[in-house]
Amino acid sequence: MTSTNGPSARDTGFVEGQQAKTQLLTVAEVAALMRVSKMTVYRLVHNGELPAVRVGRSFRVHAKAVHDMLETSYFDAG
């Protein structure tokens, strides 16, 4: 029998009893949003172009950081 204690911390925005101001995304989720490979996201993180938080052996990226990067990285072809 599976016990459900409600939504997870990630779903509700709560981290260790405190409300988080932004949602944290995995590298795979960021790659899907930006329509690039996971390697490209890792490259952006390691180059300091996309701020990320290290959680164990993986990275989490604030959704606002992804949104801000997409808003400021338009290229004018004209």
UniProtKB/Swiss-Prot annotation:
Top-level lineage group: Bacteria
Xref: NCBIfam families: excise
Lineage: Bacteria, Bacillati, Actinomycetota, Actinomycetes, Mycobacteriales
SUPFAM superfamilies, A to Z: Putative DNA-binding domain
Keyword DNA-binding included in the entry's annotation: yes
Pfam families on file: HTH_17
Regions recorded as binding DNA: 24-45
An annotated Gene Ontology molecular function: DNA binding
UniProt source species: Mycobacterium tuberculosis (strain CDC 1551 / Oshkosh)
Protein name (database record): Putative DNA-binding protein MT0521
